[in-house]
Amino acid sequence: TRKESSAASDVYKRQVIEGVMGLYDGLGGVREEGSSYHLAKVTKTPIILVVDAKGMGRSVIPLIAGFLAYDTEHLIRGVILNRMSKSYYEIIKPLIEAELQIRVLGYLAERQQLQIQSRHLGLHLPGEIKEIQRQLEVAAEELQKSVSIETIIQIAASAETIEIEKITETTEKITSTELITKPLIAVARDEAFCFYYEDNLLLLKEYGADIAYFSPLHDKELPEGSSGLLLGGGYPELYAKELEENTAMRKEIKAAVESGMPVVAECGGFLYLHTAIRDRDGHPYQMAGVLPAACQDTKKLVRFGYIELEEKESHFLEVGTRIKGHEFHYFDSEKNGEDCMAVKPITGRTYPCVIEKENVWMGFPHLYYPSNPSFADHFVKKAEQYLGGKYGEFLSFF
């Protein structure tokens, strides 16, 4: 995490890290590790606490006081009061600052126009909201009037520089000069497949791969010269009809996998490789048909939270080694696989998951490659071998 933050600071003048859930909500909901606060600690990032103050009066003071009491590193440098009227803000601001010795940087009044609806896996994506640009412009106008942007910039400028020790990688990376032709990994990226850790894609490039994006929704074939396939998470269930109608791409992907092309499919990408996706009403939509099984919307949360995946056989990792990831899905499959063992933090609870063979990795978990770079290394090497003609025929894994 420190390494990624340091690398980003070389490119961007300012970084904004958006927290998720509550500030102190970490592993299992009981540990600091993995929380937004923990992230701020390891990256030495000052915190601006945004408090939902709707319907609150003076009670907002002990609420803020509680967060400050937990702030052992004194990282909280200011507070913004969300969904509060201007008239009450002018009353409560001096009281907060006098009692808690914390700067109140401003407020944002509630406006229906600024609300963004959520759904089962979170917020709607920017490209799906017709008036998103106007919403952002209105929000910026409001914030300029009611929040001290200058003070926020000053707080950001006070952040400490992250010093990173140079560590020799245990896994030797492939450089472009070592390859006559670099393997090309085709990455699905459109409205239906949009959940990717950018760090994962950067790591694939570091290990010698080129990346080419394509759309299972709109394109008819994979990028020319593809020797690996990455199908990330997203919302294929929302575009099931369109994916079904793109018969050419479904056949293209099935043929690619059957030819032995290495494939990594996470969550939404895993759903797409099934024979069919069934919606909440049980209606089936035909998918790529690589995996002879159907997946169904269960109408309830099936898995959620951080996990570590332990390798049972040496395909994408060495036996017994682990890689970190997370799960968040309402769908379930007739064939979830059992080639890896998922281990939950805190409780240590385990369960089998993932379908994994020599050149196939697919399942519900979203992986974070930097937690074990060997995964990216293996993936790129498999793509290189495919490019060299190693995988000449498809073996039925299922």
Named regions from a protein language model:
Residues V30-Y37, A65, E245-M249:
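Charged helix-capping and loop-helix junction motifs
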Residues P236-H315:
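Cysteine-nucleophile active-site neighborhood
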Residues E32-A53:
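Inter-motif core of Ras-like GTPase G domains
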Residues P183-T247, K251-A256:
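Phosphate-binding active sites in nucleotide-utilizing proteins
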Residues T1-A8, Y12:
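Single conserved hydrophobic/aromatic residue that forms the stacking wall/gate
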Residues A40, L179-I180, F193-K205, D210, ...:
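C-terminal and late-domain segments of enzyme folds
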Residues R14-L27:
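Switch II (G3) loop of P-loop NTPases
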Residues G57-K173:
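Internal gly/pro-rich beta-alpha loop/helix module
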